[in-house]
Amino acid sequence: MKKVLHIFLICCTIFIVSCNKDNGEKIPPPTISFDRETPIYTVKVGRTLVISPMVENTGNSAVYTWKRGDNIIGTEKNLSFSSEEEGSIYVRLNVTTPSGSAEKELRIDVLPFFVPAISMAVPDGGFTVLKGEELSFEPEVEYFDNTSFTWQINLQQVSGQKNYTFLKSETGEYNILFTAVNEDGERSIEFTVKVCEEGDMPFEWMFETLTHNVSSGRTIFLRPYWIKNAFNATYSWKVNDGAVVQSGGTSLFGLNTAGLSIGEHKVTVTMNNSHIERSQIITVNVCAVEGTHRRALTGTIEATRGYFFLPAPSQYTNRDDAPGYTQFSTQEQVNEAIRNNPKSTEYGGSLGAYGGYIVVGFDHSVNNGEGYDLEIEGNAFKGSSEPGIVWVMQDENGDGEPNDTWYELKGSEYGKSGYIRDYAVTYFRPLLGQKVAWLDNQGNTGTIDFLHTHTPNTIYPRWLNSDSYTLVGSRLPARTEEVSPGNWTNLDFDWGYADNFSKKDMLLDDDNANPEGNYIGNHFDIGDAVRYDGQPANLSYIDFIKVQTAVNAKAGWFGDLSTEVGKFRDFNLMK
């Protein structure tokens, strides 16, 4: 009787579940993800790589199909892959259920040997942390299953895991060594961690420049762009050793030059907190009023001179196969190479990841006329925008060099959510063949991928002697999406950016214009120039232009977003 009752209850349960499904409950289609943001895997020739995707909403009836081209290479959830030939291989996984299907693509790089590669952003001089606070280390390591890890503090092993959380209750300096080992070799990264009381934490502030040139009557905005360990500091500002003219918690000071004489003025900012006092002197050269150094109009439409080119690390930095490529050893050599070739750089105008920039100028002052005044070529098309912010400058001191005040040309995203002023990223020199690690002034870290299919042995600018460098500007939010397996799109913004597919400022009426990614111009109005506080700059003309990659993002194995520019033109002469 109990057995009959038990069977009856089971049948009732099945019936109820069936009724629920019939009443409209639907299992969603499957989803696929992998154990890394960019699904690129590496394996040694002749070795087996097991790829275990994370698949949801599959039930018990999922069908798995792994394909290399048109050939099926697997029908299980996990893929065991090996190859006797080196190279990059693209594999597609399809998961199908009664509710639908999902598909993702990944890349497998087959290498003849592989020593573990470590990428980790380590500040110059190591880390500093408050006593009793945790410091988490999560290095990016490319490795195989037989790779082992060790963390040592002062030569004593403390962990055998890839990630490690440092925590010390005693002050002092600790030597940290992280090592990854496999049969092909080992790689290590070594640095120090200084554990301090609050009063001993080193205060740091970084200024983009300590010398400013500005036309008489204008307001110049002085501030550090990166502050560390301020601990509720106050900032006091003096002009020419006079009385304090501003004091409080803000590190931004707007100096109105209307009451100052033409010439050099010293501005002193003093930081005070409960532990230390620190001062910095900033030189402000008040120049003659706007228009004094205005240059006469010529018939030259295009920019005639390049002044400065400094890309961020990227897949196209140091490319040996670029037309006219030259191996530079100093920044001065790079600048000289573009001096008479402002069309772009020797790479065709690729500015690299966030912050990379180029500065060009004209043989005349470009007027702020009616409508658009400037045209800057980029190679954007629908679904492929890599926006750069445009800055403009007058030759305020009349020396013919772009060493005056930059004004941002306000675009459609200015001041909106995700837009950040004074956004700074520090890039760190890697070992050859490895990713470039970065650290930003918002507390984030990441890497610029080393793509075997695009780059030589390093993506860090070869000509820089320093082991790190910092780029600062304004940042736009990323609009990068994977719309289908292996197919990434970089969506455009409405208007106001270089290398951005905007029908409005490209003067187009076709959504599918420029499908081949040829160079085509975005157009800009000098009237959109704004001061640091967002107020109109009211420039009558400009002499110099800077374009800077404005997004910090990656599009899968296509790599980093990198603004690309071509010719710069005075559009007033084209109307």
Q: Model-predicted segments: where are they?
A:
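Conserved structural position at the C-terminal beta-strand
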Residues: V95, A180, V269-M271
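Surface-exposed, flexible coil segments in extracellular/virion-facing regions
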Residues: T65-S82, T150-L167, K238-L255
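Solvent-exposed loop segments of extracellular immunoglobulin-like
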Residues: N57-T65, Y143-T150, A230-S236
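A short beta-strand segment in extracellular, disulfide-stabilized domains
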Residues: G46-N57, K131-V141, G217-I227
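Acidic, glycine-anchored loop motifs typical of Ca2+
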Residues: E396-T405, Y423
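Extracellular interdomain linker/stem segments of modular secreted and single-pass surface proteins
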Residues: D109-A117, V195-P202, N285-L297
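A domain-level signal for the mature, folded cores of soluble proteins
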Residues: S136, E204-M206, I281-E386, K410-K575
